[in-house]
Amino acid sequence: VLSSVMIQGCIEKAESITRGGAKYNSSCWSAVGLIDLADSLSVIRQFVYDEKKTSMETLIDALKNDWQGHEALRKNGRFFGNNDEHTDELVNRLIADLDALANKRAPLRGGRFLFGCYIGYNSAHISMGLRTGATPNGRRRGDALTAGIIAEPGMDKNGLTSYLASAARLN
């Protein structure tokens, strides 16, 4: 309902956006947990392949055990929001790849999909997190996924300026 109030045509037609009230059709999709995905891929690359601090088997064991017994690895990687060019570029690549994938098909109402990084009033990141196991970026089983392009809580260790530099790199 809140979205319908903000969209031109819905009030005039007394219809929600889900029932054809919008004057202009657009379809969008949001990547809930995008930063969790990017940070997780960054950690796998950093610890398993580049620095060889752990094996993939050990990392999988840490995830199965919700990080218990593996605290030395948890939350010590390269994460989005710290002005880390590698991780920031990984986010850009994921955005481009996911956008290209979504646009292989047209929305039912025509046009093309608009990509969004889920910024809003919706709490999907919480409910999806409740159903998601531990992730390689240090997130525990059941914790909320990241909402939008914010850094995982506690991972933006270099302050606001570094977070803004990371966000400014995004396309």
What are these regions (language model features)?
Residues 1-171:
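Acidic, glycine-enriched catalytic cores built around paired aspartates
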